[in-house]
Amino acid sequence: MKLLLRSKIKTGVYQQITSEKAGWNWLNFEARFMKKGEKWTFETEQHEIAIVLLGGNFKVESNKGAWETKNGRKNVFSGVAHTLYLPRETVFTLTAQSENLDIAYGWCLAEKTFDPKFILPENTPTVIFGGDNATRQFNDLIPPGFGCSRIVSREVYTPSGNWSS
């Protein structure tokens, strides 16, 4: 297959929204593309963070534990995401384990420290909304009541040919 458009993304952060720039009170967001073996180190300080696997596989080593995806999805259209929640006062290094790794993550100030959690796709609650050609699948990666200060993360999948408002 010949691609008409090719991604210009090399590696690094390709999307960034800070609470200051957006005029928000809490949430910061970035999306990052990495090549195999690349490392990203981050210190949450007084923030909690949710890392969502968009495509590929990663390994995380931290002062709170270690986690690894081995069967990550190919892209956002091929299954439910792996999600890693890390509390405040966590120092971690994430390493790309696949040829290409695409992740998104949001972080915000946290009032309390919670336990880290690694959520596998098969343990992610999914809910179907709508009907007929307006059906959507909501993947509750970090639903309300999850056991964190402020972060909530939901992935919405609209099947081909359907529409969503």
Regions found by a protein language model. Name each.
Residues K8-T41, E48, G131-S165:
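A short glycine-rich, His/Asp/Glu-containing loop-to-beta-strand
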Residues N100-D140:
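Double-stranded beta-helix
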Residues K74-F114:
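Ligand-binding loop in jelly-roll beta-barrel domains
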Residues E45-W67, S160-W163:
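Glycine- and acidic-residue-biased ligand/ion/polar-headgroup-sensing regions
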Residues Y14, K21-W26, W40-F42, I49, ...:
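Fe(II)/2-oxoglutarate oxygenase catalytic core
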Residues E43, L53, E61, T95, ...:
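Beta-strand residues in well-ordered beta-sheet regions across diverse protein folds
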Residues M1-K8:
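Intrinsically disordered, low-complexity terminal regions
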